UniProtKB/Swiss-Prot annotation:
Reaction(s) this enzyme catalyzes, per UniProt: a beta-D-galactosyl-(1->3)-N-acetyl-alpha-D-galactosaminyl derivative + CMP-N-acetyl-beta-neuraminate = an N-acetyl-alpha-neuraminyl-(2->3)-beta-D-galactosyl-(1->3)-N-acetyl-alpha-D-galactosaminyl derivative + CMP + H(+); a ganglioside GM1 (d18:1(4E)) + CMP-N-acetyl-beta-neuraminate = a ganglioside GD1a (d18:1(4E)) + CMP + H(+); ganglioside GM1 (d18:1(4E)/18:0) + CMP-N-acetyl-beta-neuraminate = ganglioside GD1a (18:1(4E)/18:0) + CMP + H(+); a ganglioside GA1 + CMP-N-acetyl-beta-neuraminate = a ganglioside GM1b + CMP + H(+)
GO cellular component: extracellular region; Golgi cisterna membrane; Golgi membrane
The protein's name: CMP-N-acetylneuraminate-beta-galactosamide-alpha-2,3-sialyltransferase 2
Spans within the Cytoplasmic topological domain: 1-6
Pathway in which the depicted protein is active: Protein modification; protein glycosylation; Glycolipid biosynthesis
Binding site for substrate: Q116, N157, N180, Y240, Y276, G280, G300, H309, H326
Induction behaviour: Up-regulated in DRG neurons in response to nerve injury.
Residues in the Lumenal compartment per record: 28-350
Annotated source species: Mus musculus
Amino acid sequence: MKCSLRVWFLSMAFLLVFIMSLLFTYSHHSMATLPYLDSGALGGTHRVKLVPGYSGLQRLGKEGLLGRNCACSRCMGDASTSEWFDSHFDGNISPVWTRDNMNLPPDVQRWWMMLQPQFKSHNTNEVLEKLFQIVPGENPYRFRDPQQCRRCAVVGNSGNLRGSGYGQEVDSHNFIMRMNQAPTVGFEKDVGSRTTHHFMYPESAKNLPANVSFVLVPFKALDLMWIASALSTGQIRFTYAPVKSFLRVDKEKVQIYNPAFFKYIHDRWTEHHGRYPSTGMLVLFFALHVCDEVNVYGFGADSRGNWHHYWENNRYAGEFRKTGVHDADFEAHIIDMLAKASKIEVYRGN
């Protein structure tokens, strides 16, 4: 009887050890597959769960980013000290209109089509399908290398660039974004000579070197039809004004500004001040969403309070501070707020 009890107890003990071993193995395997980081690797006292985000992997709670997501001295994804910025910024909206986001939300479609209403309506998706047979229709900014620093210069057209001597500094950036006319020849010392991105609409378009990306800012379906025509048949010569029938740009570098991103800026950032944001605002927020570091040149008035373009000799030629289309004062306020939030560096010029 004693022998039987001893055998029974030994059997139970072996069974218990076997069950505990199974439980430990299962628990260890399950923990290894969960999206957590071990506290030892972080030098902390808690496990940290990772969640997907536009700027990289982020730590839950108030500790900020788990790690730097770029190699710049400051990164767009760095922990923000500005609740204002965090409440406005949405990294999930792509600034580029592509095959993947062709279908606009109904409210965006209605708003965009009213910017420059046309007598004849067009099926936007059909127009885009034809356009994307000519230009890539892909998002070139989808992936970011955290080991690199993508420094971007957003160069406006303000007269405060005259005599600034910013040219060499501007040219040192990875991306140099300009808009509309923006001549560089003869102004290299102040505005730089390099351009990587040129933002234009049909009525302001000009030929570009092969190494420059043409970013079309469309206000209507006809603008999409125009760029397709200008890169092929040359049939469209007029929108609401004469336009170039043919355009010499690199087809592989043509990008289309996303109307949903356009409206996001109008709703979240400029808050419906003016009918829609200025081209300068559109380019600035494009940069904020694709760059690691953003430096701003040539925005606002000059040191005398005059609003004009750097290629104009008449300092009073550009009195556009507040119109029915744009509210330059409010946009200047947004730029100041972004600078205070350490999201941009603003170079005021002369």
